[in-house]
Amino acid sequence: MTDHLKHIGVADPQRIEKYTLRTEAENDILKIYYKKEKGDLFHRSLKVKFPRLQKQLLVDSGGAKRYENTSEIAPNLLHVLDELDKITSKETEQVDVKEKILKDLRHLERVVNNKIKEIERDLDKLSSR
């Protein structure tokens, strides 16, 4: 299941926490972040560059036969991303729900605190009259 990940140097796929993908010039840059272990100050990560596939596409079919250079993601990177999605999506689904609830709770707490302060200010105005 993780053959492509092992091929790019991922020794322990179960420790993968998340990943990012960006394009720079003619390369796709994949950065894999590992779960932080006890005593680690920073997350460990692995950065891998994948050259983009270069292609020429026919852009004018009206007889001029004009071609344009284009690039696309490499097939081996697609396989790696598929494996990463399988590993990270299970954890992400569970964490996302918990994070959303915590975020909503913090927001509600701020709203209630602000409303309490507003009511207290209104009470102060009434008592100073």
From Swiss-Prot:
<dbReference type="Pfam" id="PF11944">
    <property type="entry name" value="DUF3461"/>
</dbReference>
<protein>
    <recommendedName>
        <fullName>UPF0325 protein HCH_00487</fullName>
    </recommendedName>
</protein>
<comment type="similarity">
    <text>Belongs to the UPF0325 family.</text>
</comment>
<dbReference type="InterPro" id="IPR020911">
    <property type="entry name" value="UPF0325"/>
</dbReference>
